[in-house]
Amino acid sequence: MRILSWNVNGLRAVYKKGFVEAVARMDPDILCLQETKLQEDQRSQEMINFDTYQSFWDYASTRKGYSGVAVYARKRPLANRCGFGVERFDAEGRVIELDYGRFVLFNIYFPNGQKDDERLHYKLDFYRDFFSYADALKDQGRSLIITGDFNTAHNEIDLKNPQSNKDRSGFLRIERDVLDDIISRGYVDSFRYLYPDTVKYSWWSYRFNARKNNAGWRIDYFFVSEDLMAEKVVQDAFILNEIAGSDHCPVGIELDF
């Protein structure tokens, strides 16, 4: 099974930049999208009934053209839900949960901390409350796959210019500590686990020819519960730098299912 995650930075925009062809090339069984920036009535029929996939959507109720996540899946899950039961976070349309029995998949657009203390606290609170929810499932023996745009680069290897960005949200020590804590609680960064020394990025600013110069950040992840690595269910993890259309590129994992 191949699962991909891609922050498209506007689904309508990326449809005009070769989205259909890119998905055909990547051929995922499940495709998780972040920052769709859509309301329910803004979806085209092509978006709803894309190829052979079933689609699942979550939208921001706080304002239009903001946030939003979607999942395209070839196989219908046993159950699905939006959000995780905390209204201040669920209102921004950031989470889809799909239960496939063997594993539970979360597609998440984690908040951006920005330069604003209020949004940084919101981001940190989101991390805390979501992973408390995830921990409860894991404690019940569920295998978890948590993917999406985490909006944080974990270590210096995960961005081109760590020193000049150490005071910028996305690489603040307090944000990086959260990822340390997630790992200590039994979640594995699948790409870094399999490729400890590989330098690859998943996001580049639109400014300063950042993508051309590969001045990027790795902020898109597949975190999985430890059992999926220990049992070698996760066969590979990868970053598809060659896929254009957004300021992010897709990331993915291959599972032995």
Segments (PLM) and residue ranges:
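Active-site beta-strand termini and strand-to-loop segments that position acidic
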Residues: 74, 98-101, 225-226, 246, ...
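Surface-exposed cleft-lining segments at the edges of enzyme active sites
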Residues: 85-86, 111-127, 163-167
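Short catalytic/ligand-binding loop motif for oxyanion handling, primarily in non-cytosolic enzymes
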Residues: 12, 40-42, 64-65, 114-117, ...
